[in-house]
Amino acid sequence: MLIAKVIGTVVATRKNSNLIGSKFMIVETLPVMGETQRLVAVDQAGAGIEDLVLVALGSAARMQSGSENSSTDAAIVGIIDNPEEIFIK
């Protein structure tokens, strides 16, 4: 799992049937997680722009969609309530 910040949205009117009704967000991993990267993640938690979120990748992201056959590779699975209380040593 990664900690990332929501920096944008993606609008896709045509998509795989497993993803109909899903909201897509652009997230950027935090520098403390290593090299920063931007990903498109399916929002399972109702995140908004500027939120710090937990992002599941791979099979963990697919499990969140409710279908192992989903084409999901990244999913927002949580919103961090108190970002200032994250401790990284």
Q: How would you describe each model-predicted region?
A:
Residues 1-32:
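N-terminal first-folded block
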Residues 30, 35, 55-57:
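Conserved RNA-binding domains used in RNP assembly and mRNA/RNA metabolism
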Residues 37-41:
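Short alpha-helix capping/helix-loop boundary micro-motifs
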Residues 1-3, 43-44, 81-82:
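OB-fold and OB-like single-stranded nucleic-acid-recognition modules
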Residues 54-56, 60-89:
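C-terminal structural segments of small proteins and small subunits
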